[in-house]
Curated annotation (Swiss-Prot):
Localization per record: Cytoplasm, Cytosol
Name listed for the protein in its UniProt record: Capping protein inhibiting regulator of actin dynamics
Composition bias, Basic and acidic residues: 1-11, 64-76, 159-293, 896-930, 944-983, 994-1016
KW Cytoplasm (keyword) present: yes
Region called Disordered, residue ranges: 1-293, 308-327, 341-383, 420-453, 493-522, 606-639, 658-1054
GO cellular component: cytosol
Keyword Oxidoreductase set for record: no
Stored InterPro entries: Actin_dynamics_regulator (IPR052853), DUF4592 (IPR028030)
Chief location: cytoplasm
Skewed-composition ranges (Polar residues): 420-434, 670-682, 756-781, 984-993, 1020-1033
Species of the source: Danio rerio
Ranges of Basic residues composition bias in the record: 115-134
Acidic residues bias: start-end ranges: 36-45, 140-158, 684-695
Length: 1079
């Protein structure tokens, strides 16, 4: 219950109590007696509830209890507002029966039942909630019990007071009469009223206290209730908070669960995607690998198809090249035929001129003989006379100039001057004339030389490397036995008979008809010519050198002059010997290029070559030339007695001359010169073989001993190459011999040095050269097989022979050295070993060719030993034939040759490597093959060529057989043949290189061969030295060689092949006629 409710209840109770208290009417007595006082009495009667309560309390407790019970009962049956007294008057004798109107005791007691009832029954809106009912009921019960007790007490008090009041009033009535008693009563009543008031006040205080207590209880209860409510609310809030938290937790958990599920789904999705991606990549990789594999297969297939296509194209190209080569060869053959006709006409003219020359020579010789007889007592005077005669002969000889060109376009030498060399004696004159004629004839290259025919003297360039060799070694026309040579020289049989003595003619025939003449003849002529050649060589060389010394060959360096002076000192004997034994050598005496040509380079080179051969020290002039020349000189020595003799004659290849062996001035007397040059040359040869490089170095040094030949091959890019048809083995040997100096060069170097030294010093009889040649031939034949080795061995033989020969070493030194073991040596001196295959002249031409080849080979040895292989291969019969062809020095550009040379050069340029060797080899092989055609032509065109033609045909057949074998081998070893080509020379030619070179060179080879065959037919050179112009460098590329060959100043070039050699190579076939022309 709220405090407000409690206070309301208290007021209600008080109201009830007030209603229940009824005061009776004032006693009448009172009213009457005390009118005014009555009012005061009424006033004194308690009006307020407190008063009533105080009166009630004064009622006796019994009464109050009774009343309570009664009032209780009545209250239950009537509204609380009505007083119970009206309905049931109290029984008499009780306090309730007291009528207050009359007596104060009659005042009915207060009935508090209604208040109790009201208190017990609260309005609906004030009822406590069920939760609190229990507490409130207990509170009310306590509260009402206490109130009831208080009311009962109050009633008792009231009743007692009323009773007392009645007693008092009764007493008053009793004592009314007396005022005193009345005032006393009033005082007592007043006291009672005061006491009642006090009691009422006390009661009121109690009631107030009770109310406060109740209020406190109520407030406490309210507080407790609020606290409870707050607690409940807090609990509720906590519950709600817990529920909210739980909800949040559930939500969070749910969210986390969903997040986890989502994450798992994403992870699963990712893994699935990754797996799909991986599978996709694997599939792509697989496809890519498959594609790559397929592409690789396609590429491999394409490559295979491309390779097949390339092979087919290569095969077609090769076939086309072969066809083109064949066509070129045919063209060359046709051209050679035309050139042969031209050459024959030119030879006829030359023969006529030579007849005149021979006549003049004969007269000169007779005059010289007479002078010699007259001055025989005085050697010095005799020497001077010979020098004078030599000069006269030289003067009488009209130089002839010709142009050397390689191919149609490239001109190696715009103008080559050949000055005829006339022997000092009549013999020399004749030989010189003959040689001159031979040179002129041989120089169909001489068409350019207007003076060729007019000159009666043999040009000092005994060998025209351009492909023309002097017809024979004979110093005099008489010595020329070869009909081919005669035809080349334009000499008739009568003219030839007019030539120098038969001994010379024997030698020259040996050399000239070395091809056509039987081996016996060549051997006989060789023997005779050995002595004659040595003597003639010495005389011619000395004369030449004297002329050079005296300024005839002003272009010669001092070396030429020195040798000339030396020669002059020793010339008398040398010259005579040369004339007598000169046969081929004297005839082939080569005018020093320096003398002949103003070009300092040519001169220096030629001279250097001369000296390099004769006096290597002098040779220093042109180190490159010297380098090559020593080897060339060595080669020349090894090549053939002719070439060697030419070398001995101090002939050198003029640097400017495409390929001329020009006499290099002897250092001293022919003997001393030869010994000097011979030893140097031998050393050089040996050195050049072992030292091709050394030879080159020596040449450069110029101190190198000149080759005993006295011939310095002019050093150019090209080297003379002697082509003998040989087996591939022979070719290889020849290659090694020439190129490596293993075959020819080494022996040449060794032999030349030893034999030259010995020959020069010993000056053994010219026979020794013959023997040496013979030995060389014998040795050379084997050396064909193993040319490099054999050539060395043969060279030593040559040396020993040369040593034996030393009396005439100067003349014969060349033969001694010339018996180039590789090829030239064998055929040169003693055709006997080869007679079966060749006439002595043939062998001689071979020898000269070999000697030249050797020189060339040595030169080419410097280059790469290309030539060596060629000569070594040729050492066989085929070799000799090839040698003959080789002996032609294709270098000299005879007009008809120039064209073929140019073609061959072009061809070589096209196929340089093959041409370099192949043209040589192929030219040789072709010479053998084409040789028959050329030989036939030559035979048909030349009367004296019948025998040579037969020999050549035989050789040609052999060569063709060899060529077929070589070609087969070359084809088989085509891949490896480049080296072999050099080594195999001829066989290489047949090989692919051969095809290539032949394609490039076939023209040259065919032309050379044909020309050589023609030359061989002419057989002016007993040993046809087929000098093929080969790259001194074994490197097959002929184009380079050609370019090198072209420059006349190439002497400096280390590649020893002179330009003329290159031409010779290119023109190998065309030059097949050259050896004969040279002869």
């Amino acid at each position: 219950m709220s405090q407000e409710n409690v206070s309301d209840k208290v007021r209600n109770i008080q109201k009830q109590i007030g209603h229940n208290i009824k005061f009776g009417q004032r006693p009448p007595s009172l009213r009457k007696s005390e009118g005014d006082e009555g009012s005061s009495d009424e006033e004194e009667v308690p009006q307020s509830p407190l008063r009533v309560l105080a009166q009630v309390e004064n009622e006796p407790p019994e009464t109050s209890a009774k009343e309570k019970s009664v009032s209780h009962d009545t209250v239950q049956h009537r509204t609380p507002v009505k007083s119970p007294r009206t309905k049931r008057p109290p029984p008499p004798g009780t306090i309730e029966s007291i009528n207050l109107d009359a007596v104060p005791q009659s005042v009915p007691r207060l009935d508090n039942t209604a208040a109790k009832h009201k208190l017990s029954v609260k309005p609906k809106n004030q009822r406590v909630s069920r939760k609190h009912r229990r507490f409130t009921q207990e509170f009310h019960e306590d509260d009402f019990s206490e109130i009831q007790e208080e009311f009962e007490k109050d009633e008792e008090v009231f009743d007692s007071s009323r009773e007392d009041y009645g007693i008092i009033h009764g007493s008053k009535e009793d004592y009314e009469p007396t005022e005193k008693s009345q005032r006393q009563r009033f005082h007592e009543e007043e006291k009672e009223h005061l006491e009642i008031k006090k009691r009422e006040q006390e009661e009121e205080r109690k009631m107030e206290k009770h109310r406060r207590m109740i209020e406190e209880q109520r407030l406490e209860e309210e507080k407790r209730r609020r606290q409870e409510e707050e607690r409940l609310q807090k609990v509720e809030e906590e519950r709600k908070q817990r529920e909210e938290e739980e909800r949040k937790k559930r939500e969070e958990e749910e969210r986390r669960r969903e997040e986890e599920e989502r994450r798992l789904r994403h992870e699963e999705e990712r893994k699935r995607q990754e797996e799909e991606e991986r599978m996709k990549k694997e599939e792509e990789e697989r496809k890519r690998a498959e594609e790559e594999r397929r592409q690789q297969e396609l590429l491999a297939e394409r490559l295979r198809l491309e390779e097949e296509r390339k092979r087919e194209q290569e095969e077609r190209r090769r076939k086309e090249e072969e066809e083109a080569e064949k066509r070129r060869i045919q063209e060359l053959q046709e051209k050679r035929l035309r050139e042969e006709e031209h050459r024959i006409r030119e030879e006829e003219r030359c023969r006529q001129e030579e007849a005149e020359r021979k006549r003049l020579e004969e007269e000169e010789r007779k005059r010289q003989l007479q002078e010699e007889k007259a001055g025989s007592t005085d050697p010095e005077w005799k020497r001077k006379a010979e020098e004078l005669r030599w000069r006269e002969m030289e003067e009488r000889q009209r130089p002839f100039t010709f142009k050397v060109s390689s191919g149609e376009k490239q001109i190696l030498f715009q103008k080559v001057n050949l000055t005829p060399v006339t022997p000092a004696t009549g013999q020399q004159g004749e030989t010189t004339a003959e040689t001159w004629e031979g040179a002129k004839a041989s120089s169909p290259g001489g068409p350019d030389s207007p003076t060729l025919s007019s000159s009666l003297y043999v040009p000092h360039t005994a060998i025209l490397v351009t492909g023309a060799q002097l017809c024979g070694t004979a110093v005099n026309l008489d010595q020329i036995k070869d009909t081919a040579c005669k035809s080349l020289l334009g000499l008739s049989e009568g003219k030839k008979a007019m030539g120098t003595p038969p001994s010379k003619s024997k030698t020259s025939p040996d050399r000239k008809s070395g091809k056509t003449k039987s081996v016996f003849e060549s051997s006989l002529s060789t023997d005779q010519s050995n002595a004659a050649v040595l003597a003639e060589w010495a005389s011619i060389r000395s004369k030449i050198f004297k002329g050079a010394e005296e300024g005839k060959y002003p272009e010669y360096t001092d070396q030429s002059r020195r040798p000339t002076s030396e020669d002059l000192n020793t010339v008398p004997f040398s010259h005579t010997n040369l004339r007598k034994t000169m046969s081929a050598s004297a005839k082939f005496s080569i005018t020093p290029a320096r003398k002949k040509f103003a070009d300092s380079n040519r001169n220096s080179e030629i001279f250097g070559q001369e000296e390099g051969v004769k006096t290597e020290s002098a040779f220093t002039e042109t180190s490159p030339v010297q380098k090559e020349l020593p080897s060339l000189g060595t080669k020349v020595q090894s090549r053939g007695s002719k070439l060697v003799r030419i070398a001995d004659e101090e002939c050198m290849f003029a640097k400017d001359l495409p390929s001329f062996l020009v006499p290099s001035p002897p250092h001293g007397s022919p003997k001393s010169q030869r010994s000097e040059s011979g030893s140097p040359i031998q050393a050089e040869s040996e050195d050049s073989d072992t030292k091709d490089e050394d030879g080159e170095q020596k040449a450069q040094g110029g101190d190198e001993q000149p080759s005993p030949f006295g011939i310095k091959l002019r050093r150019t890019n090209y080297s003379l190459r002697f082509h003998n048809e040989q087996s591939a083995e022979k070719k290889k040997k020849r290659y090694s011999a020439g190129d490596s100096f293993e075959g020819v060069p080494v022996p040449l170097t060794a032999i030349d040095q030893d034999s030259d030294n010995s020959t020069l010093s010993e000056k053994s009889s010219p026979i020794s050269p013959q023997q040496e040649n013979i030995e060389f031939q014998t040795t050379v034949a084997p050396s064909k097989e193993s040319r490099s080795k054999f050539s060395r061995s043969t060279l030593p033989l040559a040396r020993t022979e040369g040593d034996n020969m030393s009396p005439k070493p100067p003349l014969y030194q060349k033969p001694a050295t010339s018996p180039k073991p590789s090829e030239g040596a064998t055929p040169l001196l003693s055709p006997l070993p080869k007679p079966g295959r060749r006439t002595s002249g043939d062998t001689i031409s071979q020898r000269t060719g070999e000697a030249e080849q050797v020189a060339t080979e040595q030169g080419s040895d410097h280059k790469g030993g290309v030539t060596a292989s060629g000569p070594s291969q040729k050492s066989g019969q085929g070799e000799e034939d090839v040698k003959e062809k080789k002996s032609f020095f294709p270098s000299i550009s005879i007009p008809w040759r120039e064209k073929t040379d140019r073609r061959t050069e072009l061809i070589k340029k096209e196929k340089p490597s093959l041409q370099a060797r192949h043209s040589l080899d192929s030219s040789r092989s072709q010479d053998k093959e084409t040789g028959p055609l050329w030989i036939t032509l030559a035979l048909q065109k030349q009367k004296g060529f019948r025998e040579q033609q037969q020999n050549r045909e035989e050789r040609r057949n052999q060569r063709e057989a060899k060529l077929a074998e070589k070609q087969a081998r070359d084809r088989e070893s085509a891949g490896s043949s480049p080296t072999e080509d050099k080594g195999n020379g001829s066989s290489s030619i047949i090989s692919k290189h051969q095809t290539a070179d032949e394609n490039k060179r076939p023209d040259t080879l065919l032309a050379r061969f044909e020309r050589r065959d023609n030359l061989k037919k002419a057989n002016t050179l007993p040993s046809s030295v087929t000098v093929e112009i080969t790259d001194s460098t074994p490197s097959p590329p002929a184009t380079k060689d050609v370019t090198k060959r072209f420059p006349p100043g190439d002497t400096t070039q280390v590649s020893t092949e002179p330009a003329w050699l290159a031409l010779a190579k290119r023109k190998a076939k065309a030059w097949s006629d050259c050896p004969q022309i040279i002869k």
